[in-house]
Amino acid sequence: LDAAVTAAAGIGYPVMVKAAAGGGGMGMGVAVDEAALRTEYDKVRAFAERMFGDGSVLIERYFPRVRHVEVQILGLADGRVVALGERECSVQRRNQKLVEESPSPAVSPELRSRLLAAAVRAGEAVSYRNAGTVECLLDPETNEFFFLEMNTRLQVEHPVTEYVYGVDLVEEQLRVASGLAPTFDPDALAPSGHAIELRINAEDPKRFLPGPGVIRTWVEPTGEGVRVDSGYTEGNTVTPFYDSLLAKLIISGATRDEVLERAKAAVAAFQIEGPKNNVPFFAELLTNEEFLSGAYDTGIVSRMR
């Protein structure tokens, strides 16, 4: 605790108190002063020991208004590391992602160049070989970005990158593991179009509390640029024991505006009866002016609620 107090004093308040072994937004708290730090430290440490078997805690700078942007990298069999653009992941509840899109509406060509170069350097520094995600926080006022963590695996949201870059990341992982060259030209990677993923969860659309139950109706949307990844169908039981993700609704198109229009139609056509689900939330989000403008941050869901 004394080390945490010293670290926080050096960083400056407010700070984020984070479980070192945590993930998925679990094991995090914000401290605005030393008294709050002492409380949050004990709370996060106890949670981390109970959930992860490791009570180690990190103290980080906290940004009240920030965007969550991540870079998809791929460490190739020949030793090179390439970046396949960025994903915007700022629509979150309880620090867990609900929406991901690529390219990010917040990232200019100049910022993209810096962001991708930094992610590639991170991969090169550890001789990385595989698909991986370098996650960052982006200050929209200054365009400064700060390293969060690297996920050494595919992310739930990898399909949006696949659509925009025309690369099958699962296949490329297997090729790296087999010592084979990629199917694409690493020197000619360039984004084309836009893609958005909506995480359809079994949860109340207002407070996002778990909503298990038996699926009575399950009708997936179809249409140009519409894809649904799911393992559920009518008659299945959604239990409270696992992650609430029911499906990934992935929309692609030539422009962000086109994708948003397709997403509205797809959400309206997605019928799920039985367990509570967040489809109504997405219908609301897709009419929200802040989201439609692209000028949103990680606080957008709390402002909607």
What are these regions (language model features)?
Residues L1-G27:
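A conserved helix-loop-beta module that forms one wall/lid of the active-site cleft
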Residues A19, G24, A31-R305:
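ATP-dependent carboxylate activation and anion-phosphoryl transfer catalytic cores
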